[in-house]
UniProtKB/Swiss-Prot annotation:
Residues 45-52 are annotated as: Complementarity-determining-1. This is Immunoglobulin heavy variable 3-43D. Residues 20-118 form the Ig-like domain. The gene is IGHV3-43D. InterPro entries: Ig-like_dom, Ig-like_dom_sf, Ig-like_fold, Ig_V-set, IgHV.
Length: 118
């Protein structure tokens, strides 16, 4: 069965390592338009709750686009206009984990998603 990009989303998962800092993203699957998806990012090698965290993405053939930011304590969140009202960023400092809940997915959300520390 073949799927076109206009019908499904494929969010590829990459593992990023820089020095001792490790950020491992997971949760990418094929999702129907209008569907939902939750991405996770497990952090290690630094004091997670000392840093604000970001999600960024890269659509095929495009540059990096900032998606969302959450403060160190989760008290403040910020979103790109393109995802506002559809995406929710959260974190669990006890688990050194960052999350991105993505609802009402659109074709233009098709991208590689990365977590990043401030």
């Amino acid at each position: 069965m073949e799927f076109g990009l206009s019908w499904v989303f494929l969010v590829a998962i990459l593992k990023g390592v820089q020095c001792e800092v490790q950020l491992v993203e997971s949760g990418g699957v094929v999702v129907q338009p209008g569907g939902s998806l939750r991405l996770s990012c497990a952090a290690s090698g630094f004091t997670f709750d000392d840093y604000a965290m970001h999600w960024v993405r890269q659509a095929p053939g495009k540059g990096l686009e900032w998606v969302s930011l959450i403060s160190w304590d989760g008290g403040s969140t910020y979103y790109a206009d393109s995802v506002k009202g559809r995406f929710t960023i959260s974190r669990d400092n006890s688990k050194n984990s960052l999350y991105l809940q993505m609802n009402s997915l659109r074709a233009e959300d098709t991208a590689l998603y990365y977590c990043a520390k401030d």
